[in-house]
Amino acid sequence: MFARKNIPNQLTMLRLVFAAAFFGVLQLYRYQAEPASPVWVLPVATVLFILAAITDALDGYLARRWEVVSKFGRIMDPFCDKILILGAVIYLGSPRFLDPVAVADGSFRTMVSGVYPWMVVLVLARELLVTGIRGEVEKAGIDFSANWIGKLKMILQSVVVPVVLVVVMIDPNRDPGNGYAWLGWVRDVLVYATVIATVLSGLPYVTGGIRAFKRLKPEPEGSA
């Protein structure tokens, strides 16, 4: 029973290890760099991210199934999620995925990842806002668990990152006549859908936080 109790938390911490390895591998990549980045970088990064995402699906499921949900898990699980996802978004929106040819041509599609700095700002802002609201509300003893759209957001984020990396590997922009140009549009649709879902998933937390703060607001002195 002791070993079973610790497996979900061990999976959570394993996700942090996978995330660190994922960032370390991506640190070796730069689009159209001279000399070229090692060919194994993006495939290995993709596998590491998928493994990290699998641990995210497993740790919560096993904790609930075995009824071993812990305070450690409630804190570290979302923390590791944010490290993995936010780190991935920051890397994908960084100059490492900037297309110098598109920049020189004055194209508006300058990121081979399809992730732009303004998207990174929106995702970071959403996470910071929700984390702040949740911290204040749960400090008062009110449950503020993830809602269904928040879970959908996490699924989309977990899918879009490996898809983006695979599209960058295929690189439909390098040769528009290679028949893979449609992959760029698939990437863009998924990226924009994920950004929209990320922003919208924060709205229930904002409205729920406002209602919770109103309930927690102390009554004026002398009121009945």
Stretch-by-stretch model annotation:
Residues 1-19, 28, 39-53, 136-224:
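C-terminal membrane-associated helical module and adjoining short loops/tails
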